[in-house]
Amino acid sequence: MMYKELCGEKISRLGMGNMRLPTIDGRNGPIDEAKAQEIIDYLMAAGVNYYDTAYMYHGGKSEIFVGKALSKYPRDRYFLADKMPSYPLEEGRTPQEIFEEQLKKCGTDHFDFYLLHNLCEDSVPVFTDPKKGVIPYLLEQKKNGRIRHFGLSSHAKPETLKAFLDQYDFFEFVQLQLNYLDWEMQDAKQQYEIVTNYGVPVWVMEPCRGGRLASLTPEADKLLTDCDPGRSVASWAFRYVMSLPNVGVILSGMTQMDQAENNVETFSEGKYLTGQEQKVLNQALEQFRSQVIVPCTACHYCDGCPMELEIPDILKLYNRYSLSKSPMIHMDVAELAHGPADCIGCGACASKCPQHIAIPEIMAKFAEGLKTLPKPKMNP
């Protein structure tokens, strides 16, 4: 396992994100604790020592599970990371109430790493509101040893991130959405450079973009597998961010054991991309981007649609539709409780989207496209 000295700690380059744990009966079902525990046990045995959770993951159940799953191990064998959410603060809860609840749910007396969650244009006023006192409270907890290292995760625009870091000079690390697709498309390069110039390491979230970079298009996949038949397509995404000099921890959400095994293999070999491999990856990316892709990561920040649309599921289908125009998409859409045609265009989802996707416009385009897409021919 690869390790790196970060914030004075020896941390595994691979960290486990706990936003997409295996579940029972679909995404909205309860966490499959037996499978999730098996994955954590495997990662612990492989030397992974960084585990990330958050208040909102799995409807508030991720923190409870992670605390329980790690409780079988000595507390000094792993680093536990959690985050301060902005939404409950907007609703009137205090940072103290939230922080104390998180400690209790995780069954710990301190967090090794603690972050402001989802810095963005909407959350900056909440985190910096002097009446709420979020940052002073968390700095006090750090002084008292209940937070060992203080950082932030960001989906903000580059100018917002820079202004925030210019104002506050005490953050020890910054977590960014970083992958080879977003390097240009979502200004990840500019954000990476801002944090690097600030002088602190970058933690990576969405290195495989919610699994989207685990398989590109058949043509793009072939470019990568022909270059190195022994590697998975997903491993290229991890090796890309691993090769960036200021990247520290790289988080991966692992819902299946084979994903964990593949990641451990990648991070045990620790092979950075060569110049030739980077050229091949650029060719594969160009082929992939030539298709119509909506950059959804299935983070579910858009949950709560007034028409009860499962927006990430629909956007996933839209990408499949865009890539193939297969009549079978009709069957997949029919399985949804509510389809793209049910969108009323209110825009509530778009205002929450960290990827700044124009969701109502995509829904309208998808619904219109389905009207002209031939229905599948069924055998008699």
Predicted regions and their residues:
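Structural motif
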Residues: Y42, A46, K105-C106, G145, ...
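Short catalytic-loop micro-motif centered on adjacent basic/acidic residues
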Residues: Y50-Y57, R148-L152, Q175-L176, V249-L251, ...
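Structural motif corresponding to the early beta-alpha repeats
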Residues: Y57, Y73-G92, Q96, H117-C120
